[in-house]
Amino acid sequence: WWRELLKKLAFTAAGHLGSVLAAKQSGW
């Protein structure tokens, strides 16, 4: 079950990183 948890964590981290990068590009 920990693999599913790890996958979910990685997916969440990737999404968070994407939003942070988008914010930086928009001038934050």
From Swiss-Prot:
Q: Which UniProt keywords apply?
A: Antibiotic, Antimicrobial, Cytolysis, Secreted
* Cellular-component GO terms for this entry: extracellular region
**What are the transmembrane regions?**
none
Where in the chain are disulfide-linked cysteines found?
none
- Tissue specificity statement from the Swiss-Prot or TrEMBL entry: Expressed by the skin glands.
Its subcellular locations are: Secreted
Q: Name one GO biological process term.
A: killing of cells of another organism
What is the role of the protein in this entry?
Answer: Thanks to its amphiphilic alpha-helice(s), it may integrate into membrane phospholipids, leading to lysis of the membrane. Has no substantial hemolytic activity. Has antibacterial activity with a broad spectrum against various species of bacteria including both Gram-positive and Gram-negative groups.
Assembly and interaction partners = Exists as aggregates of 3-4 molecules.
Family under the similarity heading: Belongs to the grammistin family. Group 3 subfamily.
Name of the molecule in the record: Grammistin Gs A
Which species does the entry assign this protein to? Grammistes sexlineatus (Goldenstriped soapfish)
